[in-house]
A protein has these predicted regions:
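Glycine-/charge-enriched secondary-structure boundary and capping motifs
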Residues: 1-142
């Protein structure tokens, strides 16, 4: 419901959506841009990639525990959603307004979305090269 409400109000500002399931960030996030990247390839332009800001969202304690028990954090992003169940790629100049709209929806939905949080966690940019592998299509920066 919250995503539908956002689409009703901001459809022209939403460029991609993805449900982050098994396969984590690396397998799911690149699926947001297949048509845009096909077009960019035909135009001789570099593909779009996603760059996420480390520490921009709270990673649930279960993943910290897995890391403490020896799981490699970078590989966990290839398996788990790391607390991000759904992502929207939106116009940068509308991002904060959309985050606020999600918060307003959650606050006024009789508690059904009380645990839902929205935040800006990264950006979409043109790759500096071909970006053929998943690791080249999804980057993390400090």
């Amino acid at each position: 419901r919250p995503v539908l409400a956002i689409l009703e109000k901001f459809r022209s500002s939403v460029h991609g959506m993805v449900h982050v399931t098994g396969g984590g960030f690396y397998e799911n996030v690149p699926r947001m841009f297949p048509e845009a990247n096909k077009k960019r390839e035909l135009e001789g332009k570099a593909p779009l990639i996603s760059v996420f800001k480390k520490g921009s969202w709270e990673i649930p304690a279960i993943f910290t525990e897995l890391e403490n028990r020896g799981a490699a954090k970078d590989r966990m992003f290839n398996t788990f959603n790391m607390g991000i169940g759904f992502m929207l790629a939106v116009k940068a100049d509308k991002a904060e307004e959309i985050v606020k709209a999600f918060a307003d929806f959650a606050a006024n939905d009789n508690g059904r979305c009380s645990t839902m949080k929205a935040s800006v966690i990264g950006k979409v940019v043109a790759a500096s090269g071909k970006a053929e592998t998943q690791e080249e299509q999804v980057l993390f920066e400090d």
